[in-house]
Amino acid sequence: MTRKTTFARLALACSLSALALGAQAQDKAVELKFANWLPGSHPLAKLGFEPWAKSVETASNGSIKVVLFPAQQLGKAADHYDMARDGIADMAWVSPGYQAGRFPVFAAAELPFQISKPGPGSAAVDKWYRSYAATEMKDVRLCFAHVHIGTLHSKKPITEPSQIKGMKIRPANGTVAQTMTLLGATNVQVSAPESRDALEKGVADAITFPWNSLLSFSIDKAVKNHTDMRLYAAAFTWVMNPSWYGKLSATQKKVIDDHCNNEWAGKVGAAWGDDEDSGQGKLEKAGHNIVKLTPQQLDAWKKAVEPISTQWVEAVGKNGVNGQQVLGALRQELKTRGAGQ
């Protein structure tokens, strides 16, 4: 089944679900301002935001009009959670890792060498986090969570974790920043849209990023070496303003609920994740150096970053969270779906 067919069937199912509520008076038209910080040409826009928006509009018989605001039009990348909370946007695509320490439980999804497959991994993270979102993200209403998987892209080939010492690295999120600090690097905190400039000006030597997005942001112009490993997962949430949701009719709420579920988490995660992985072949074809690791080298990486999970358990424990239990639940969900490492 093609990805296009999969999304079409999911959209049809959502539409039929809305129709099944029975004939009702036409709902009052509402606009959903959906903010994200990716360029409009980004794969997630084409494979996630746009299909989702179209499906919502179809299922609501046009009563919910989704207006996409890409490329930080409504605010900076790190501000998108607060934008949804404050009503600047009705819905926002959020990278919780851009605000290190603010969402400590969610950060467990971003621990290194933990997730191997973005589709089932997204479904696993989404199902797991729904038990904690009402407390940790209480200012907003969670739609769903999903992940992509990334690696290290650098100006020089990197095969051993010991080579990280002394480097200046742009981390994907707060958890990756901790990992790089552990390995002896200095973190360069810039958002994705600012990363190419930081690398070209020598402010950073390397970046942790997914494969195809490297091309979307033109970062491939600045780094030519790419270490082939599933180093980390970056986890994201789609969140909405509770007041906006509260003003919807019962029919419209049902439409949104049908689009804010575990199935959509897995579909969006798979569509984007598969596209990201395709970037490796594109870079190799363009003459970039894909750095392959031996099993021994990969084991050395995994051993070197083991303390990060221990640190996470200890950190959340100070806030009364049973870190071992939370992490165990996540890893069991990943294992059940065949998405662990």
Regions picked out by a protein language model, each given a short descriptive name:
Residues S15, A20-G22:
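N-terminal signal peptide c-region/cleavage motif recognized by signal peptidases
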Residues A123-R130:
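Signature of the catalytic double-stranded beta-helix
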Residues L12, Q26-P120, T135-Q341:
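N-terminal secretory/targeting leader peptides
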Residues M1-A11:
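Bacterial N-terminal signal peptides that target proteins for export
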